[in-house]
Amino acid sequence: MKPLSSAIAAALILFSAQGVAEQTTQPVVTSCANVVVVPPSQEHPPFDLNHMGTGSDKSDALGVPYYNQHAM
């Protein structure tokens, strides 16, 4: 009988601790009234941190180097 009561007490403590962990101190407010979800473009990665990467230079899109556009 004693091992059964110990197991029940351990299960009670475990489940009550899990219930306390799931509670939040602030109420969760979600408003989805004016939300527009736009999928990312497949042409460019979302975070292109490499400024020397392919396709990130405007001269690639124009077909000529940008520094040759200005007359010296």
From Swiss-Prot:
Entry keyword annotation includes Chaperone: no
Highest taxon, organism lineage: Bacteria
Single Gene Ontology BP annotation: response to antibiotic
UniProt keyword terms in alphabetical order: Antibiotic resistance
GO cellular component: outer membrane-bounded periplasmic space
TM spans (from-to): none
InterPro entries, A to Z: MarB (IPR025732)
Protein name: Multiple antibiotic resistance protein MarB
Species, as recorded: Escherichia coli (strain K12)
Gene name in the database record: marB
